[in-house]
Amino acid sequence: HVKEVALGENGIIEGAKPGTVLIDMSSIAPLASREISEALKAKGIDMLDAPVSGGEPKAIDGTLSVMVGGDKAIFDKYYDLMKAMAGSVVHTGEIGAGNVTKLANQVIVALNIAAMSEALTLATKAGVNPDLVYQAIRGGLAGSTVLDAKAPMVMDRNFKPGFRIDLHIKDLANALDTSHGVGAQLPLTAAVMEMMQALRADGLGTADHSALACYYEKLAKVEVTR
């Protein structure tokens, strides 16, 4: 979709004047960002890839994290524009680096949710109140932003999407494709993506990614509740 908007018929490449800067805040494959940037540059159009993290709550309150790839001078010029909607804006390297950073972010989030789901399912199956387990561990080394955001959702059975499983599958697929291209191995990412695909097959593709817990609950025949 981004390629079509940028390079397609009646796209940015056909209408934008030289000197225009495209700040692409979507989450796409790093290779796609580089290809789009190269085509635009031939027409005198610069580009930053600037995906965001934080989900709907941080978008609403203007505290998103923005990770940016592209020319540093262009980044500096438009920093204040991006900072107006963000809590942090970090230049991570050349074009495509923003989306590599976003993929790394999505890997960490997915694996955190999976680990949380395993732990709370274990507690529930062992007859221990998962809410008390959560309260006990959240202040220690196992505590995290993901744990605090997603554990209450699971225990309240609130899977209203802040970030849908469908979208996380897309990001993990891009992470795996990128890893194959650079020769990295992501075995845990591959495993979690299979779990999410199974949930999508069960009709949970539009649920919040915290519904990953349902995969573990189904195996253990329990429900993680307060």
Label every PLM stretch briefly:
Residues 1-9:
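Glycine/threonine-rich flexible loop motifs
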Residues 5-6, 22, 27-106, 110:
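Rossmann-fold dinucleotide-binding core
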Residues 12-18:
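Short, conserved loop/helix-junction motifs that constitute active-site signature segments
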Residues 61-69, 90, 94-126, 135-149, ...:
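Active-site-proximal catalytic alpha-helix in oxidoreductases
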Residues 95, 99, 143-210, 215-216, ...:
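Interdomain hinge/lid region at the active-site interface
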Residues 129-138, 190-194:
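Beta-strand segments within the central parallel beta-sheet cores of soluble alpha/beta enzyme folds
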